[in-house]
UniProtKB/Swiss-Prot annotation:
Protein name, per record: UvrABC system protein B
Keyword Ubl conjugation: no
Subcellular location: Cytoplasm
Organism this protein belongs to: Photorhabdus laumondii subsp. laumondii (strain DSM 15139 / CIP 105565 / TT01) (Photorhabdus luminescens subsp. laumondii)
Recorded name of the encoding gene: uvrB
SUPFAM superfamilies: C-terminal UvrC-binding domain of UvrB, P-loop containing nucleoside triphosphate hydrolases
Top-level taxonomy: Bacteria, Pseudomonadati, Pseudomonadota, Gammaproteobacteria, Enterobacterales
Amino acid sequence: MSKVFKLHSDFQPGGDQPEAIRQLQEGLEDGLAHQTLLGVTGSGKTFTVANVIANLNRPTMVLAPNKTLAAQLYSEMKDFFPENSVEYFVSYYDYYQPEAYVPSSDTFIEKDASVNEHIEQMRLSATKALLERRDVIVVASVSAIYGLGDPDSYLKMMLHLTNGMMIDQRSILRRLAELQYTRNDQAFQRGTFRVRGEVIDIFPAESDEHALRVELFDDEVERLSLFDPLTGQVQYHVPRYTVYPKTHYVTPRERIIQAMEAIKIELEQRRKVLLANGKLLEEQRITQRTQFDLEMMNELGYCSGIENYSRYLSGRTEGEPPPTLFDYLPADGLLVVDESHVTIPQIGGMYRGDRSRKETLVEYGFRMPSALDNRPLRFEEFEALAPQTIYISATPGKYELEKSSGDVVEQVVRPTGLLDPEVEVRPVATQVDDLLSEIRIRAVKNERVLVTTLTKRMAEDLTEYLEEHGERVRYLHSDIDTVERVEIIRDLRLGEFDVLVGINLLREGLDMPEVSLVAILDADKEGFLRSERSLIQTIGRAARNLHGKAILYGDKITDSMAKAIGETERRRAKQQIFNEKHGIVPKGLNKKINDILQIGQPAGGKRKGRGKAVATAETFSNLSAKELESKIRELEAKMYQHAQDLEFEQAASVRDQVQALREQFIANF
């Protein structure tokens, strides 16, 4: 029997959770294709879904609207299911400039990208888990609707090794090269292998913990062992092991040869069309580029931009949807769309933007028409591929409500008894000075403040103004990358600063119980950022705190403001009635602060290295000035010793601790 989900939690479902779990579970068992969970901020929507997954025991994909929320959900699901496979699948690009052509200035922009190795490994781990086991939860961003390698080709390319298997060393090395692994006898890293006599060490592309040692004797696999790639220490022996390809885009040799023939036929057809229209430059361009790609595919089995030939490599017909992560999800899988009011429109918009750019490339001879099939799913294709779906939002959109026939599962009462924030409207004229006084009240109580503005310029000016008045403030904007954004939110929770200013980045799903005040500047300016849905979501950021409050600065109450305030008061009234009926006293949340992906930074701003965690400054908070000085000297000696031994990560870790102790010394003595 396949492994089942085992939910770990110190809490039992409370508030509206038991009823929501029952309704969602019954709906799925009855075969309902679409259900909507209207869950207010802090009502434990993730815990509700975790219970449904555990009860039904079905592989699940959770779609989030961005990497930050996906990282938060991944962290929470890992806490709930430590014994099961919880995976993370988002775009692995830290930076991505797609191939593009600007006809007006005759400018061709080459594709340029920076790949995050850690996220690439997590993506490979996600598809491996879906292929190997049933107890899988994959937390994904909208990256899940983009083309991925064909699962059939991916499965065919695997290298299966078992003890006692008859295979010579040269055959294993040839197969590893086909899987796009490279030989590197000096630097042993992910996606490489090394050879020492009759021993082959392979560092699997999807692993960050184990490497495989294959010991051969007379063309027979004598022993398979998993070992620590850093220390070389063997951890345990295994009877069999499957080596997965280094990339999702790997293709069997026979399929590549078939694809090359089809590409040649299309090239000839395209050349005729371009010549017939007098496009000599475009004809020369497409011929040169395609012939170079064909040469590379023939010699190496792949080429730069091979995804543009995905129609032929996956054996699909023109216009057919590309293979995506949905093709790896079993037929009885479950789809959970988090913050659906944002995620669903995103899915619909991806195809159109991609298509417009590629049509220009095709028209001017940079790509052949088949490149148009290297694309994200169209919305109707997504609908056809999606299994049974639960939409989750505090403010469900029109689409979700229609799909679930207006029958919504409500989760308004929180297990903690916390009420929705009090909402107050104040005049715009004094908004900045009024905000400053409110921030100071919160800072004294060690509480945090979120401020949302309408423009980037105003956010920058406000941040500068607050800094000049001695407030500890940071500004969250769209230029900040995913990892740094996670770290800023973590630093806010840790109390590194008190105020976070942003524009449209503080709305959905950011889980910060320390935030007791949300200030919405210029709330009476109707528009996308001040719509009913946006206001409800932003107000909800203060709903995880016992003293939660939202201040809307506006000179008039717009329709959106009236609806948002009315809905917040409706929910607050329902929560109060439930609390009084059941004798519940609201309790603040005490949520632990995790390093969401284990790729963030600890407070203090420096990344942790491998090895043991160092003690924090709090460990030495009771030391006298003399003892503290002695401790700093001791740690400095330790730091220099690590550096002398070339253990730079440990040295950096101790350096951070020394810095924290020095700050403590200055503050206290």
